[in-house]
A protein has these predicted regions:
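Acidic/polar helix N-cap motif
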Residues: 7, 114-116, 141, 145
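Gly/Ser/Thr-rich phosphate-binding loop
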Residues: 1, 12, 17-25, 34-98, ...
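Conserved loop-to-helix N-cap of the C-terminal "lid" that shapes the substrate pocket in Rossmann-like
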Residues: 5, 20, 99, 155-158
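Conserved ATP-binding/catalytic segment of the ANL
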Residues: 105, 121-123, 127-168
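Short, P/G- and charge-enriched loop/turn segments at secondary-structure junctions
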Residues: 94-101, 148-150
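Short beta->alpha linker loops
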Residues: 6-7, 28, 58
Length: 168
């Protein structure tokens, strides 16, 4: 089901009407649904919804906690980029054990580097870089491509910041 624009109550009605099993959302959609009155939030049957995936922006811890409380442990999160550098993922249980996490690396070789391109200590934020088999290139824009590559050309970034904890 594709919505022309997101309206929180309409989304819930469509889940019920079409017995949606899987849905892709962004954190803003969660926030908007959580602002609905309780009677509206609980008016629609979501029992067919098995997996709700979210990405595209950081999800505030409080919002995700409230969504898991409301929908149960069906919420999954991933981090990646259109450029295809790498991919991390976590389910509700993994997230609850590490609130704020975007999961463990599933694809790519992750490196968190400081401003000197040195590995950042565990728990210290740094720029997210991935070493991939096929680095991406911006179409007809070699200067921009060069800005997103390590000096040796083996790693790429989109400029996001993150950190790795002791559990990876």
């Amino acid at each position: 089901v594709i919505m022309e624009q997101f309206e929180p109550e309409q989304y819930l009605a469509l889940v019920e009407r079409y017995q949606v099993t899987h849905s892709q959302l962004v954190p803003t959609m969660f926030s908007r649904m959580l602002k609905l009155p309780d009677e509206v939030r609980h008016k629609y049957d979501r029992s067919t919804l098995e997996i709700a995936i979210h990405a595209a922006a950081p999800c505030p811890v409080q919002v995700k906690e409230q969504m898991i409380d409301w929908w149960g442990p069906i919420i999954h999160e991933y981090y990646g980029a259109t450029e295809g550098l790498g991919f991390t993922a976590c389910d509700s249980a993994q997230w609850l054990a590490h609130k704020g996490s975007v999961g463990k690396v599933m694809i790519g070789d992750l490196h968190i580097l400081d401003e000197n391109m040195q590995p950042a200590p565990k728990g210290t934020p740094g720029e997210i870089w991935f070493k991939t088999a096929t680095p991406f290139e911006y179409f007809n824009d070699p200067d921009r491509t060069q800005q997103t590559r390590s000096a040796d050309g083996t790693m790429s970034t989109v400029g996001d910041v993150g950190y790795v904890d002791d559990d990876g």
